[in-house]
Amino acid sequence: MSIEELSTEIDVFLLAEEDKVAKLPKGAIIVSDPVLQYYESLAPGEEPKQIFVANASESLRCVYPLINGSLKIESLYDTGSQIVSISEEKAMEAGLSWDSDIVIYMQSANKGVENSLGLARNVAFLFGDIVLYMQVHVIRNPAYDLLLGSPFDTLTESCVRTTKDGNKTITIHDPNTHQRAVVPSVATVWFGP
């Protein structure tokens, strides 16, 4: 089998009887592994071609902007979030004020629903020489200090470059001055809610 012949379809098998060696019960569903099939199909002594596969997980990435001219905050870069948000504790440390009449309801990863405390408007974020003004939702006790979601990407027309070792750099554009900057990110360990 050549590497080009690797299956792009998933083969699924239903175990007709218990497999005592593999400790699988009758009725277990077995999914084939095309990479393993390729390696097992090689003739003795045949040199395998290198196959790149994704890691099972990757570290989340953080950046460290100066917020409101007063506090550098570890900011979780999360393009899957619809908002930019900050913990109540860090909002207070940075001296932010917020409008408590603007509240959103959010569903967390554990399916709970919580409301935000309000919206801090036009908060200054300094990345190198670039100042961006973001609308930031204030959240009570989130699992992060600050979360940079899609509004950050949209405002900055960001371009992310990811390397095979997991490093990410984010190129941002200041819509007010038209400056560009490359912002390095740092791996972080996130334990979730």
Regions found by a protein language model. Name each.
Residues 77, 94-95:
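Short phosphate/oxyanion-binding micro-motifs
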Residues 11, 32, 82-89, 95-193:
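Aspartic protease core domain of the pepsin/retropepsin superfamily
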Residues 4, 9-70, 104-119, 147:
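Pepsin-like aspartyl protease folds
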Residues 75-77, 146:
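Short conserved micro-motifs on helix faces and helix-strand junctions that flank
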